[in-house]
Amino acid sequence: MVPVVALVGRPNVGKSTLFNRLTRTRDALVADFPGLTRDRKYGRAEVEGREFICIDTGGIDGTEDGVETRMAEQSLLAIEEADVVLFMVDARAGLMPADEAIAKHLRSREKPTFLVANKTDGLDPDQAVVDFYSLGLGEIYPIAASHGRGVLSLLEHVLLPWMDDVAPQEEVDEDAEYWAQFEVEQNGEEAPEDDFDPQSLPIKLAIVGRPNVGKSTLTNRILGEERVVVYDMPGTTRDSIYIPMERDEREYVLIDTAGVRKRGKITDAVEKFSVIKTLQAIEDANVVLLVIDAREGISDQDLSLLGFILNSGRSLVIVVNKWDGLSQEVKEQVKETLDFRLGFIDFARVHFISALHGSGVGNLFESVREAYDSSTRRVSTAMLTRIMTMAVEDHQPPLVRGRRVKLKYAHAGGYNPPIVVIHGNQVKDLPDSYKRYLMNYFRKSLEVMGTPIRIQFKEGENPYANKRNTLTPTQMRKRKRLMKHIKKSK
């Protein structure tokens, strides 16, 4: 499971600046959920190939009423949901009562916490952090987030060792095995008996959506009708439950972000929305079922979730729930709204269901299998190059500075989502419109459905770049004669 790192501290200690450094963004709006996470922002970050989710919390005022009552509710939730906390203090302002109150609260939670002293630029770091040792949180890590100083050291000496301890990399790298086997097939070598086959693995299926759209009802409907072997496998400390199941002789692992509950116990008060559980489920899944309430339509929260799914490259099936009981006129209006607001993801299947009564639920798995098969299918270099050539013949690349962009060949670069790597000259100058044309052409030719497809471009190396031609003695004499002739003609 992807680790979660929360940044907490008083207002204006530099949390958002560090957040932007870690997520490599400027506006910190990587996966923002308006109305639910007013003062929490979420982003995907990476250090040496290890991914983690970073939370930027709102400032904590630490008034005399105490942290427990005055701390922003969203910041409290962020601390509870995080695996590790980076507690930030302002080295310029020095130790404040609010810092002591926050430290007391963090100690009571017994959460792994690292103390980070920001704004140490222009100061003696050792002298600036002395007072903060009284907080009793161990070693202090001085940084200057605005200039990036000390941030890399913080990642390498704090976060990386911590992630290696609590979330070691899996011994089996599915992607590496997949492409190793692909290379064996490309070279015509005989495959070993224990080949990696994506079809032999269970499909990890996450059901996500806003509160009260029917996620738990759909989960229980699926398990109630098709339960074969079900037992709870806690995946993390956060209540996400992995439920093995089988349907039509195909194994699945259902990632339930709301927890498995008896139908009678599902109430509005109980089914609370957890952003972190949802983001982790999306990251860990092969296919995501995005559940939308037909009666409420598509909200900004739905679009934010959708954006995170697309950025993660996960396969997608859209489920419009509570379809029963709507008049034909309302149904037509809902479909028009879907076409208008979701027209940019025409690759995803849309299902209209009633999780409560079970209508349409059985058809979901056909789309889930289709999306998974599309995202894990191996395609040869010859096939991809042939499709690229056909696309170029149908619509030539544009001219750049009087020369036509040349695409040479294409090959596979990854799966889940499928990645096509195209090599050529001047590809960096290709306009976005032509890149979209190529993406749609590959999607149509490969009949990819249910999964985004990504195209990466690589520039061909110029063997003469940064090289100067050395003239031979004969060429030098010829050049001198030519220069004399030019001077005389003047």
From Swiss-Prot:
Residues 377-461 form the KH-like domain. One of its GO terms (molecular function) is GTP binding. It comes from the Bacteria. GTP 2 binds at residues 209-216, 256-260, 321-324. Residues 3-166, 203-376 form the EngA-type G domain. One of its GO terms (biological process) is ribosome biogenesis. It holds the Pfam family MMR_HSR1. This is GTPase Der. It comes from Salmonella enteritidis PT4 (strain P125109).
